[in-house]
Amino acid sequence: MAPGRKRGANKAMAIGEMRLGDLVLAKVKGFPAWPAKIGQPEDWNQAPDPKKHFVQFYGTGEIGFVTPPDIQPFTSETKKKLSARCQGKTVKYFSQAVEEISAAFEESQKQKSDIVGNEALLNAVEPSVTKPKYLNQASSDGKSDKFSSRADPCLGKLVENNGAEINPDVGEQDSSISNNRNTSPSSEPVEHGSPDPILKVAVDDKIDNVTCTDHSDGTGNNLVNDQRIIRKTTDDSNKRCKDEVRAKRVPDSRAATDNHILGPNQKLKGSIKGQDHGSKKGQDHGCRKESSDSKVVTDLNIASSKKPKELLKEKKKRFENELGKSASGADESKRAAKRPRSEDAKDQKQCKSKRLVPVGEGKAEISDSTGVVSIFKREIVLGISALGGKNQFDKDMVAYTKRRKQTVEHTSVSSFPGSLVKEGANHPEQKISSSSDSDIKVQAAQLPKRRRAVCIYDDDDDDEDPKTPVHGGLSNIPIASTDAPKSANASHNTSIKAKLLAGSTDSVKTGKVPLYKHNKDASLALPDSVEGYNSRMGKPFKALLQKNIKPILRSPKNSYQLVSFKKQVTGQNKTAKVAGAGMPDSVEGPSNSSYMGKPVIKLPPQNVKQTLRSPKKSPQLFSTKELVAVQNKIAKVSGAGIPKKYHGDSSKDVVAGSDRVSSSHSQTANQRSKPAFGEKPTSTPKVATRLDVEVSRDTFVNLSADVIDVNQENGNAPLFSFGMSDSSSSCMKDLIAAAQAKRKQAHSQFSPFVNLDHNSLNIDSMQTSKSPFMVQNVSSPAADATLIVAQEHQEVLTPSNHGRQSSSSNQAGTEENEERRFSSGHRSVGGSLSGATEAAISRDTFEGMIETLSRTKESIRRATRVAIDCAKYGIANEVVELLIRKLEIEPHFPRKVDLFFLLDSIIQSSHSQKGRARSLYIPTVQAALPRLLGAAAPPGTGARENRHQCRKVLRLWLKRKIFPDFLLRRYIGDLGASGDDKTVGFSLRRPSRSERAVDDPLRDMEGMLVDEYGSNANFQLPGYLASLTFGDDEEEDLPSTSQEVKNTHMEVKITHMEEPVLALGKLEAHDSSSDKPHCVVDVNGGLEMEDASCQLKDDVCGIEAKEDSPATTCATELPSFPAGSPPLPHESPPSPPPQPPSSPPPPSSPPQLAPAPPPSDHCLPPPTAPLAPAQSIALPPSSITRPSMPSHPSLPLQPGFAPPAYPLLQHEYQISMQRDHSSIATSNQIAPVPVNAAHGRHADGGVKSEYLMPQSSSFAPVGMCSYGEPLPFISSKQLEYGNSDVLFKQEASSQNQQLRPINTSFLQRPMIRNLAPAPSSHFPLPCRIVQSEPQRSSFPHPYHFPSQPVDGRQHMNEEWRMPPNGCSADPQYGAWIGVRNPFPGSRTVTDGVFQPPPERPPSGTVRYQLAANNLQGGSTISGNIASQMLLSRPDVPSAAQYRPS
């Protein structure tokens, strides 16, 4: 049983039957059948739906997809019904819609009447020219008549003569064209509210030669009076006639000149004599038969005034000449013709509307370029301007007004030899072009043979990659629509001569490949030499284009359809492809083989449309791919309207940049100065400006020096390196490399980031010229390479910047400008189709991330990923330059560190990868490392933290062997040798872990091998890591000599922890600068490594301190304080609590510091006083030799303490000790040594083993942790009060100091910033000292303080107990003696036993009451064990006990 019929199936029109621009009634749910016309979804950025028709509704201007069953054709009957219905109450806008569609329908009907003449022409054409197949197609198109009638008076009916014979080649092309058109989104329906698409038939048919009878005098046949000679040069293809086919005169000259009257000189290649709109596609195709490949030249001598014979003669002559020229393109034409045939069927089905294509060499080329080109939009848009009569003109006017939105003057296009103007059949452009042609009234004789009338058909722009609305929107192409009325009138008189540049290799090239294919990205191919052309109106072609351009912009749909100029220079392969409509960059002269200076950026029509609508979104304007390697000289111009050069008078119009790139600067300037067409020099710039502003803002064609390295001599070189296909990616890299090299030269002198060459841009000229495109490369090729298309750039760049900008004086402003230019310019490089576009996007993204970078792993990771992506596009050098420039201009040091961390992350990530990222970033950064370090870690005290972080990163690189060791070591040494660490105040020390910001990537890195950024996190044993990796960090904060013990790995091997006393020599401290043994010396509270071979002994010798002897056994002299060290505080600390009665009076004068030699094992220097040797404290050898302060380099300043300078050298420290009236006794035993903590030097947290005393004579141990191994605290030396290093010189009494520790406390607090609040008298001793007990002669208890790993960070918050008589089992964790006030819960050591400290020990808690004046100064405390006591301030009484809060 047969299936039931679909409801409405009988009314439904098959999609294949519907043509673009057909008038229909579309039923939408909730509304009556609404007047609409078939449109192209691509014009509206809509994806085509194969099962539905895309319609544009009249009245509301809305669009939608409607199923075929819901669509019925709009006919006379339907019109009557709707009119009657409108008499009553109707839905809002319905009446208006009916009126609009009725008007469109009437126009189409008029066109049908005109098309009759075209049928006659088609019939006149030899059958070989037209094939019945096409006739059939035309008949199928017959349905489209209503469409054409509605959409285009000329086109709509052009094809009505279905029976007319159509040139088989043309027919095929037409069909293919129609298919393509259907496919192409640019079909006229896109127009809002314009019921009539401009000749849609032409678009659909893509018939180059199809002419609308509308333009005919109105009789429809008058134009035919002129004989149209069609010479069909067929390559030996079966499809095409091999012999030239001369079309017999077609009584209907109108048909021949449907689009525009063809003067005797005019040749319609693709046009078929019988271009019958009635025949529609068939005829149109027939007309197109001439399609470029076939090189059929149909000379429609339509000028009514001229006799057909005369016209024929003239045309013959011209044609023969042209044929000779175009002979070379014959083969290509064949191919093109073949393609169109296959496509025609599809096209006819999909697009009934026919495209009128003006005859011209351009068409032939188009067809040559694979009939597809002609089919799509290559077809020269029918020059509607060639209207046969007044009626035609009136019709054109109407159509024009309706279609005002977009049209490129075909005349202007045609004026370009070999240039193809594509115009949607439904676009008024065709009409306009024809009309403009008539207006131009340039006799065939006037036009050079090369020149040919071109109509731009953009209907297929979407299909064609090359077409880009933005490109189309460029100011270069004037819209013919403005001229349409004029041209319509003149069209009768004027014949448009479409010459085939047969000889031009360009045409051949394009002919071989469909222009669409050639210009996937650029819809326009400008003839290389358009300069000489004048529009029919007598105006420079470009001027016309400029006018048209603006409207195009207004109607983005059509903009991409603007003119696609294929500028063909005979004999030259150069073709400048203009992506935008009508972007002839340089109309200057054949000399400029590529209009635009050769760069034409192509974008797929869809992209173009989008760009027009949202130019900012079109960073893709540049279709990099389409730098057509195929065309040796094709320069891609971005849709953004890369400045084109017009030889025209107006410099404004000229976009010198592109030409300039190709040509010498002077030439460029000249070209710029010239207006594109010599018409309204200002108008073009305005258009360009608009385009630039809209498009270029986001899609500036910023041809940074790096982006474009244009060889001036090679005008043909692609203007944009990024407009390149993969094949040209290497080229782009070369260009970028060259630009960067130049940039580097400019920047070699500390100039920030990428300063384009001084000559790179002449912004002033741009501004003065007012041409948005006027980017003038001042003097250098790099400058040429740099083009800024957008006015925005011009605005951004001030003339001062023009002066450019390398000068350091203008550096900041210049940098900003450059940055702006750089980022925006890269944006301009956008082309979704091209890697260059993606590269530009990635670069811009990276630049944005730099601006918002924070020191968080996530932020750095994101930016790193983008940087790696940039490397994939070959712009790693730009990324590095961006970083350098940002580092150089960044005023805040922490931000510099963030950026350097980002660089580190990029380097580590690229190092871990194989391939391009690694190959690009590593060498690039290596070469730029001096600049990077100079910018990230500048000299000066304020950048100390930066240098520290940079050294850390460099050591990491060294460890991972990312860069050569010698190089990294040199830089590390340079950073370490800056010496400012010694002079920088303690306040600049690196914050402790607890103080770091929560987002600090280094905060939680104890367990990581270092990938702070989370990308390469390798975990190690925390102890090992801490010692190797982070202790280093802390140490760096400590002042260090150039030999700073910041060995890259901080490998301090404390192998002999078991031994209470180890030779310092056993500690292996690998200094970055040298491996010489170092002596750890307490310098104002900071442990410093000093070269002291004498001190490197297996046995730790007691240091004999002599009261008045400044000499030290270490043979170190007491240098004066470093110039940068802060002076000792002059103000006395708050009055200390009263001393215990037994405490000696403050010394009258400070004892001279007697530096203690490295104590030999248990070797006690003879006490100056009878102090019991027990009081000497064994100094752990490790502390003596520890390479540098481990992770405690920085202790927060205690209130009351002057900010300590970074630890000074031992000499300096000793001096300070002298000044503080203290001396250090270095011994293996810990003895109470009062030190005035106020001497800020010791405050450095790095002093792990020193006792920091508050400013009172008493002191608190800063860190009792032996640096190397735990050492028993054995009194190796008596504390000599006067002779001892640290204790106040009491009156020469030989009494043993009576130490009454009241709650001595050892706080295990590495990195404690605050000095122990305990009264300075508090002297936590591991030794048993009873408050009431006089000092013990010795402290037999060996307190083995576990060697402190280089990094004690992990122990920061931990409190370690020291067993009374043993070494700490864990060598990794040294017992740290807290510097802070003992807090509740903290352990205090009393009598060698840890005890919970009092909540806050009173000021006298641990005060050692000096029983005798000669209280033996505490023996020196080993570096980690607080062996070196901070000196008490001289002005503070020795007994004074000051406990800072």
From Swiss-Prot:
Domain of life according to the entry: Eukaryota
Transmembrane segments: none
SMART domains: PWWP, RPR
Disruption phenotype: No visible phenotype under normal growth conditions, but the triple mutant plants hulk1, hulk2 and hulk3 show delayed flowering.
All copies of domain CID, residue ranges: 838-979
Biased composition (Basic and acidic residues): 228-257, 274-293, 331-350
Domain PWWP: residue ranges: 20-77
Region (Disordered): 133-197, 211-302, 319-356, 409-439, 460-491, 641-685, 797-835, 1110-1203
Presence of the UniProt keyword Nucleus in the record: yes
UniProt cross-references to PROSITE patterns, sorted A to Z: CID, PWWP
GO biological process, alphabetically ordered: flower development; mRNA processing
Polar residues bias spans: 173-187, 211-225, 660-673, 797-814
Function per UniProt: Probable transcription factor that acts with partial redundancy with HULK2 and HULK3. Plays diverse and essential roles in the control of plant development, physiology and flowering time.
Protein name: Protein HUA2-LIKE 1
